[in-house]
Amino acid sequence: MRVSQVYRWQIPMDAGVVLRERRLKTRDGLFIRLQEGEREGWGEISPLPGFSVETLEEAQMALLAWAQAWRDGAEPPLPTQPSVAFGISCAQAELGGELPQAADYRAAPLCSGDPDELFARLAAMPGEKVAKVKVGLWEAVRDGMVVNLLLEAIPDLQLRLDANRAWTPLKAQQFAKYVNPAYRQRIAFLEEPCKTREDSRAFSRETGIAIAWDESLREADFRFVAEPGVRAVVIKPTLTGSLQKVQQQVAAAHALGLSVVISSSIESSLGLTQLARIAAWLTPQTIPGLDTLSLMGAQLVRPWPESALPVLNIDALEPLL
């Protein structure tokens, strides 16, 4: 006998979370829980405002229709909305025992605000020291100075930078001007520095700073090809689609010798623990980009190891099905 349940949830967010110039006061999403006999599987569906093509309401409609059809014995195709396809495919993978339990809970800590806050945490990190810095939110010159300071202060640090296409070519050059050329090889990559891929490629050629594709992966004309200066791709499964599509993209990138970073779209702790399992499975050599739980006021259903945030159980969820 099949049982499918759909829950809606809301978590308060840290006051400082701004996405695409809008403040995110709460994180809202859905869970699907599939049960068949003794087996069960969970998945998270949480479109990210300003980034996902679908709204939460659209995702909810598609999810409920799929869940009802599956419960009634059908094998419905995955919905087209990326977050819904991803969440359902994770629940199916858990149900079928296809999503390994081993997880990569290492985090590339997210440095936002004062770089002094990061020094102690990084200095205490065992093994590979990798951190992420969001750039493009302030003046490009300030960003360059902060990045230079971090690389100078911690000699074995590798930085991942994310500009979210914020810079014109001129601003990107202003940033690079303040990063000592001797340190630039320790910038693991800079995600999407400019508004167009062509400008980003030119930036890499002119500065020697490696770049990574993120938003580009979700554009219709994107193709996986080896390009000078491109070192990595960043895959956000909630924005990508089904687990199968994520696997295909990882395989295509690895075939070209590119690093692949599995990255958060600010999922709940349940979704983040699944992403940690996907990272351990598909990208075991690469620290994932999952350091977003601290932006939230609580965890849901499944806790992240060593997080001090309170954990809310199923009783805190709103049942829809």
UniProtKB/Swiss-Prot annotation:
Keywords carried by this UniProt record:
Lyase, Magnesium, Menaquinone biosynthesis, Metal-binding
Record GO biological process: menaquinone biosynthetic process
- Pfam families to which the protein is assigned, alphabetical: MenC_N, MR_MLE_C
SUPFAM superfamilies on file: Enolase C-terminal domain-like, Enolase N-terminal domain-like
Q: What Gene Ontology molecular-function terms does this entry list?
A: magnesium ion binding; O-succinylbenzoate synthase activity
Q: Give the matching InterPro entries.
A: Enolase-like_C_sf (IPR036849), Enolase-like_N (IPR029017), Enolase_C-like (IPR029065), Mandelate_racemase_C (IPR013342), OSB_synthase_MenC1 (IPR010196), OSBS_N (IPR041338)
Reaction(s) catalysed (UniProt annotation): (1R,6R)-6-hydroxy-2-succinyl-cyclohexa-2,4-diene-1-carboxylate = 2-succinylbenzoate + H2O
Where Mg(2+) binds, per the record, is at: D162, E191, D214
Could you tell me the EC number(s) of this protein? Answer: 4.2.1.113
Family indicated by similarity: Belongs to the mandelate racemase/muconate lactonizing enzyme family. MenC type 1 subfamily.
Report the protein name in the record.
o-succinylbenzoate synthase
Q: Which taxonomic lineage is given here?
A: Bacteria, Pseudomonadati, Pseudomonadota, Gammaproteobacteria, Enterobacterales
